[in-house]
Amino acid sequence: KRYKLCMLLIMCITMTYIAAGCGSKRDGLTITNVSYDPTREFYEEYNKVFADYYMAEYGKQIKVIQSHGGSGSQARSVVEGCNADVVTLALEHDISLIENTGLIDAGWKDEYDKDSSPYTSTIVFLVRKGNPLNISDWDDLIKDGVEVITPDPKSSGGACWNFLAALSYARDKYNSEDKQKEFLGKLYANVSVLDSGARGSTTTFVENKKGDVLIAWENEALTSLASYPDEYEIVTPSV
């Protein structure tokens, strides 16, 4: 049973507040996209395509400044005054937090037909090459001695999806709510590092070589695999 976990990222939510210093200039336009951690590489490429489109459509240059971090932290930074023209975040809750301040007009969820999302990913495990602990599903992550790396749900949108994927697995396997809570408790007892964002967790696992398994967005795991094809492999859990 697989779930495509929608990243409720509204790709072009224009803030009703236009940050000071951002705006039209004679030589073009500069805007700031406040986004979450694993979208760095995507927007580096997407911004080039968007700039070409903007020039062809409007005859002006446009430069997009990128800001990345944990989705929850990014949302709070905008509420607290961070200059942003566009926000692309991992959770509906994070965008609603900004909407509640009046910086985004109500009705942003209706911008896409059928409440769709611009793009999606799913949750996977990244393990060391050869999968030495034979990790295949969520049950393996609660075994004694397995060191898990995942970001903190308090600050990271990806971490919330990691938690919800684990919860979905627990609900499928256990009828008892107590058993479901016990499963989640064991899982997070095995987490050795709770970074503030998904990219921080990737750095902890991939660069700093900590942990046995990283719970991650599939696109984030694929980025690591492309950089280190001989050191890691992806395991796709049942949920």
Q: Predicted regions: what is each one?
A:
Residues 45, 49, 140, 165, ...:
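Amphipathic alpha-helical segments that form well-ordered structural scaffolds
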Residues 16, 80-81, 208:
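Alpha-helix termination/capping residues and helix-transition junctions
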Residues 25-155:
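N-terminal segment of the mature folded domain
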Residues 50-54, 170, 225:
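Hydrophobic, Leu/Ile/Phe/Ala-enriched alpha-helical segments that form helix-helix packing faces
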Residues 174-238:
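Ligand-binding pocket segment of bilobal, Venus flytrap-like solute-binding proteins
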Residues 1-30, 52:
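Short, low-complexity disordered leader/linker segments with a strong preference
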Residues 40-45, 154-182:
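Bilobed "Venus flytrap"/periplasmic-binding protein-like clamshell domains
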Residues 121, 134-137, 158-166, 201:
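Internal, well-ordered alpha-helical segments in soluble enzyme and binding-protein domains
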